[in-house]
């Protein structure tokens, strides 16, 4: 029979396994693109069986969606840290912009081509980009209040420029 406390141990290791799979998949997808990476390779890179992988994630698209969500969560945590440690809005914008460019350069161009073939994951990514655009506009407005930017700066235009840059990079 099952010993006491065995079940709880199993469920925490399950959560850890899920995290490990997502981390490995993020790394593999961003480095190589999505299409070229198989569930077999993800399992092999973790030293787990394919069956174990499929028990946690039924298919590649579900795993990809979780990867996107994980990246967004990491992004939110990063931005929060930047806000807490920056002396003004301009510094926040520069540090975040630099970080997004670094992240972009660390990502294989194929990733951005491949993700369009996964509608739900692609939508998640686009929603997040729209959200960070709104955040950017709010930051510029805050910057005007702090007297860092002139108030005749057109936020929407600046924001579109920043976004177009990222869109150009991603396409």
Q: PLM features: residue spans?
A:
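Short hydrophobic/aromatic patch on the recognition helix
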Residues: 47-57
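Amphipathic alpha-helical interface segments
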Residues: 24, 28, 52, 99, ...
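Short secondary-structure transition hinges
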Residues: 98-138, 148, 156-157
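Hydrophobic alpha-helical segments that form the core
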Residues: 150-171
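Basic, helix-initiating cap at the start of DNA-binding domains
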Residues: 1-32, 36-45, 62-65
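Amphipathic, non-transmembrane alpha-helical scaffold segments
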Residues: 14, 18, 64, 68, ...
